[in-house]
Structures are given as structure tokens and as C-alpha cells.
Amino acid sequence: MRNMITMGEFIVKKQADYPTATGELTSLLSSIRLAAKVVNREINKAGLADIIGSMGAENVQGEVQQKLDVYANERFKAALEARGEVCGIASEEEEDFVSFDSELSRHSKYVVLIDPLDGSSNIDVNVSVGTIFSIYRRLSAPGTGVTLEDFLQPGNRQVAAGYVVYGSSTMLVYTTGFGVNGFTYDPSIGCFCLSHENIRIPEEGKIYSINEGNYIKFPDGVKKYLKYCQERDEATHRPYTSRYIGSLVSDFHRNLLKGGIYIYPSGTNSPNGKLRLLYECNPMAFLVEQAGGKASDGFGRIMDIQPTALHQRTPYFVGSTKMVERAEAFMREFSAHEDPANQG
């Protein structure tokens, strides 16, 4: 039996490799880990408690807030504020960023952007849901109040990013820019334990994930790419398999381990796509690039986009490098008019 390594031990060991490390990021990741355990507990008993269903209100995205959305948002906010290693957060569930104003928080150097519970509308039918997080160094001076500009940074400036998938087992996957590692929660000891070390996404995959019910609304480039995926060709091992859960974390997690592409394109009713650049796309882009994959808006690198708004949306193509590059080629050939570079 191999030695069990907890996430806490793993992070401390990695920190020891950098003598100048102060431990603030280690403490911050510990806070996220703690909140994930609390949310996991509530999800596991959701069917027995009065937390399934909607609150009857909408969040800033215009989506009906689920009770667990609100619960998860509050738990992560509380955990991140408690230790003072974060000066503020931006959440998919909040209209504006949240500033933490304790003396310790104001002098901290990190901000966190988070989707507290991705896919929560599926919780009452027992489909896996998740949490997505992203960490940046603030741009404003420590000791001052956090500003909007601290959050509106391109993804290539991320310090760390990760997600938690709450499913048949609960798993936390993260990167600090030195590879991707996954930790599975062991409820018997209350710890996340290293289960997937140095995750690498296959360069080529056989899975495509997209909501084909929206096919009629897709750009021509996406329609042509889907046709390519469905055509038989032994040389390229086609047709590919279609797998779509409707929870970004779950679909991304499967494709990360098995190889594949996840697509949420623009549409006639959503010209900028649906997914949020800051809360969903950038964190997953950082992870997939660190694992050897690629993330794009169909024409260019997701992490090079300069955000202009907290809740900005973007088309999204993420997964195995060769699959994403092939999808980009179809977009350039058949949907070039949608490329922002070609628009005034």
C-alpha cells in the first residue's frame, strides 16, 4: 500500500521548494479546502434537508438562485474572510465584488474569483456539481481598499486556479502554475488525499461535449466541426463519442482525464456565449494549459483576453490540444466574421 499524502502535506512540501514563500497562498488554499468540505457535507445530505430547490430570486446573471448556490457562496465567503489572506472576492452570485475590510485583509496580496456551485440546477436529480476558483495578486497597494481593477486581470496573470467536483467521490484539482494535481476526499479521516499526481490531458481525444439541442443556433464553424466529429474515418478514430452532462466542472473533469473537447459557443440568442470569462473560463484554461491542453474563444487564447466587466461572457473551446486547434481551424474557415479581430 502506498503512503497516503494529504493535500495539506503536499502543499507544505511544495512550499518548502521555494525558500522565499511566505505561506499566504498555502493558507489561502487551506481556506478553500475547508469550505469545500463544508459544502460537500451539505450536498451529501441535500435530499434530507430543506436546501434543495430555488430561493425564488435571480442572481446577477438573471439565473434563478438555488438554495445551495446561496449556501455555498456564504460558506466560501466566510472561509476566505476569516484568516485575512484575501483582500476581496468576486463571485458569480454577487453583482459587485466584495471587499474584506479587516486590517489583516487590507494588507493581504490576493483576490479570489469564484463560482461557488456550478451546475446547481442539477442537484435535485443527483448530477455532479462543482466549485471553480481563481486566485490573482492584487494590483492595488496593500493596505488600501480592493478595487475593480484587481479583479479585471487577464487569465495569464493567475497565481492559482482549481475546481472541486462533488460526485460519487469528491475531488479537488488545482494548479499553481507547476502542473496539475488532484486530491480525493476521504470522509473517514476528513482529508483530501493525493490521488491523481501530475495530471496530463491526452493530446488527442475521442469525446466532444456540447449541448447539441442548440445546434440550430450555432455558428457555421461549430456546425461543420460537429459534422467532422460524427463522420466515420478509421485513420482518425472517428466518429467521436458525444458526452454532455450540463455541468461544466463534470464535463471538464472527464475530458481532462480521458481526453476530449468541451464547447460552449456563441449562438444567435447569445452572441457572446454563456460562460463567464472570470469565474469559469479562465480558471479551467489555466488548468488545462498546465495539463498540456488548450483553451480558446474559437479564434485565440482565452487567457490573453483583457476583461472589461466582472460578469463578462465568452464563447469557449477547451480540452485536448489537437481537438481545440481543429475546432479553431473550422471557426476560421467558416465563421471568420465572428472573430473579434475582424470587427471594428
Curated annotation (Swiss-Prot):
Keywords from the named record: Carbohydrate metabolism, Cytoplasm, Hydrolase, Magnesium, Metal-binding
Pathway: Carbohydrate biosynthesis; gluconeogenesis
Coiled coil spans: none
Binding site for substrate: D118, G119, S120, S121, N211, Y244, K274
Position of the signal peptide: none
Chain sites annotated for binding Mg(2+) 2: D115, D118, E280
Keyword field contains Metal-binding: yes
Subcellular location: Cytoplasm
A molecular function (GO) term: fructose 1,6-bisphosphate 1-phosphatase activity
Subunit composition and interactions: Homotetramer.
Protein family: Belongs to the FBPase class 1 family.
Designated name of the protein: Fructose-1,6-bisphosphatase class 1
Organism: Aeromonas salmonicida (strain A449)
